[in-house]
Amino acid sequence: MARRPDNQNPEGENLRIKRVRLESVRQNDEEEENEVSRTQNIVTDNRHDSPEAVVEIIGERALENTSEEDGDDDLSLFRALEEDPGSDHNTSNNDSGNHDRETMHTEEPEASSGNNITLTNNVEELHTMDVLSQTANTPSASPMLDAAPPTTKPGTNSKEQTVDLTADAIDLDAEEQQVLQISDDDFQEETKEAPKEYGAAKDYRCPICFEPPETALMTLCGHVFCCPCLFQMVNSSRTCRQFGHCALCRSKVYLKDVRLIILRKKQVKKKVKS
């Protein structure tokens, strides 16, 4: 191993190496130029030959051109190194910085996904805790319910009791309605069965409508009206429809006092002549 002198700096060594490389590149360029001139001479000599040979020579020249382009690239690189000795270090630093950034970008999604997983786990744990607390609180009310005495008697069914209660309520409502007022519809339903008509009913006329009454009703004052006219007479009163006035004598008429009558002719016995 050859020792380098102490006075020589590393920058000087780098410059010397670069110069040696440049000299080798220049020699290669000169050799390539000589080869190009030779190929040109060969092309001129072989112009009258077959086209295949021409194609082959052109292909070789294309390869030489690529080598020339490579040499130009090497020259540009060496010149850049001579101008800026610390460029290699800078490029290496830039490459390392880019690599670090890429690694950071790749690590960030992994970290975010990990955070999302932890958040979902925490939410699920909180939900389970709430459910457990609710289930723990619900049994506290059960002893009070168990301690309450049963309202139903032993040996009876709850459904039967509810049915009986509703039936009693319906009966009470019906009785109250009957006591408070008797509607016209109920009265008409009671008198649907029309009595048999006799000759006198056909001859009698209602003093209001002047028609023979299908159902004759008599008031306390002794006047007879047909059923529709009597109800209209009572309902047209101005005293809250509690009672009406007779159309003939203006006496008070209550529906509860009205009577259903059957009109008949007086039967007169005929004397038999002897």
From Swiss-Prot:
Q: Which organism is it from?
A: Saccharomyces cerevisiae (strain ATCC 204508 / S288c)
Q: Which Gene3D superfamilies match?
A: Zinc/RING finger domain, C3HC4 (zinc finger)
Q: What happens when the gene is disrupted?
A: Leads to the persistence of YEN1 foci.
Query: What positions are modified (Phosphothreonine)?
Result: T66
Name under which the protein is recorded = E3 ubiquitin-protein ligase complex SLX5-SLX8 subunit SLX8
PTM sites of type Phosphoserine = S50, S67
Keyword terms:
Centromere, Chromosome, DNA damage, DNA repair, Kinetochore, Metal-binding, Nucleus, Phosphoprotein, Transferase, Ubl conjugation pathway, Zinc, Zinc-finger
Pfam families (alphabetical): zf-C3HC4 (PF00097)
Q: What does this protein's UniProt record list under function?
A: Component of the SUMO-targeted ubiquitin ligase (STUbL) complex SLX5/SLX8 that mediates ubiquitination and subsequent desumoylation of sumoylated proteins and proteins containing SUMO-like domains for their degradation. The STUbL complex SLX5/SLX8 stimulates ubiquitin conjugating enzymes, including UBC1, UBC4, UBC5 and UBC13-MMS2, and mediates the proteolytic down-regulation of sumoylated proteins. The STUbL complex SLX5/SLX8 is involved in ubiquitin-mediated degradation of histone variant CSE4, preventing mislocalization to euchromatin.
Q: Where is the composition biased (Basic and acidic residues)?
A: 13-28, 97-108
Q: Subunit arrangement?
A: Component of the heterodimeric SUMO-targeted ubiquitin ligase (STUbL) complex composed of SLX5 and SLX8.
